[in-house]
Structures are given as C-alpha cells and as structure tokens.
Regions:
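C-terminal "cap" of GNAT-fold acetyltransferases
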Residues: 1, 7-10, 14, 20-21, ...
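Acetyl-CoA-dependent GNAT
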Residues: 10-87, 91, 96, 109-110, ...
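Conserved G/P- and acidic residue-centered "switch" motifs that form tight phosphate/ATP-binding loops
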Residues: 71, 103, 120
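Active-site acidic-Proline motif in GNAT/NAT acetyltransferases
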Residues: 96-98, 102, 130
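Short polybasic/polar patches that bind polyanions
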Residues: 100, 117, 140
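Residues forming the Rossmann-fold NAD(P)(H) cofactor-binding site
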Residues: 102, 106, 110
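Conserved GNAT acetyl-CoA-binding A-motif
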Residues: 109, 114-128
C-alpha cells in the first residue's frame, strides 16, 4: 500500500519554470546550498563556485524549474544556455530529502532536457561532487556519460555530458 501512496503522491508534483527571485525558488536554492554545505567534505561556499546567478537562470539566458507538491516547493533544477556552442549547463539540481525516491529528480531532469531541446541545445553538461552518489546514479541512468573536466569548478569531481540527439 505504501508504494501506491508514494506513486499517487509523486503524480501530484508539478514541475514548472519559475523566476529565481520567487519565494519558492529562494527556498529551494537556499536548501540546496545548505545541503551541499553539510555533505561536501570541505563545506560549500557559493562565492567559490561557478556562478548560476538569477540573471543566468532567467530567460533568455537560462531558466529555473521548481518541483511543487501540494503547494510546497520540494525540488529544483536550472539551465544556463550557451547558444554559441549549443550546450546547456544543468545547475542547482536538488530534491528535498523527505520526498527522495519518488522520481522527482528524474522528472526535473526530464523537464530541463525538454526545455534545452526546445531552445536548440545539442547537449547538456553538468558537474557534481563525489559525495553526491545518488546524483551520479541519476545522471548515468538518464543517459549522461562521464567526460573529461570541461571547467574548473572547485567542488566538482565528476563531469558529465548528454547528447540531446540533434544538431542545428
């Protein structure tokens, strides 16, 4: 019965593009930073990380999606578009710990992929920290392959890329 209830709960989640200055977006981004601070061996200082500013997460430069369950924000993910290379960077992937296992990370990533394709992107890139093993598993299951480092993100240990199946 618990599995059925979890499936019903997951079906009630909505993943929508949201202004990064919105209160739900601020909550998700703050929660994301706090979790990284707890989980990374060295802690996490957003000022030391490669940026994903509000402007970079706002169309036409990029976008932010929020997963919302029964009126509460429970996850997020963002894209930064690089139109010159047709690459979109996946940033700020986070799902609240109490709703993990419902497939919300996959749904956020699928929405980001669809948004990237609709804007002419040929591939997605992302980087992640070694302490986020569940994130690496999600990315691999979603078709991302580990590649050589493509940036100098100080908190990254793994870099991934996914071909979106077309070139413009």
């Amino acid at each position: 019965m618990a599995d059925v209830e979890r499936l019903i709960l997951a079906s009630r989640v909505r993943v929508e593009i949201t202004d990064p200055r919105d209160i739900d977006a601020r909550y998700c981004l703050r929660s994301y930073f706090e979790e990284l601070g707890r989980r990374f061996d060295t802690g996490f200082d957003p000022a030391q990380s490669i940026s994903a500013s509000d402007e970079e997460m706002t169309l036409p430069n990029g976008l932010l999606v929020i997963a919302n369950l029964l009126g509460a924000p429970v996850g997020c993910g963002a894209l930064k578009f690089h139109f010159d290379t047709q690459i979109a960077e996946v940033k700020r992937m986070w799902v609240a710990s109490d709703v993990r296992g419902l497939g919300l990370g996959r749904r956020v990533l699928e929405r980001l992929s669809a948004e990237a394709v609709s804007r002419g992107m040929a591939s997605l890139r992302l980087e992640t920290n070694r302490s986020l093993s569940e994130a690496r598993y999600l990315y691999e299951r979603a078709g991302f392959v580990e590649v050589e480092p493509f940036n100098n993100e100080p908190y990254a240990h793994h870099w991934f890329q996914k071909d979106l199946g077309h070139k413009y």
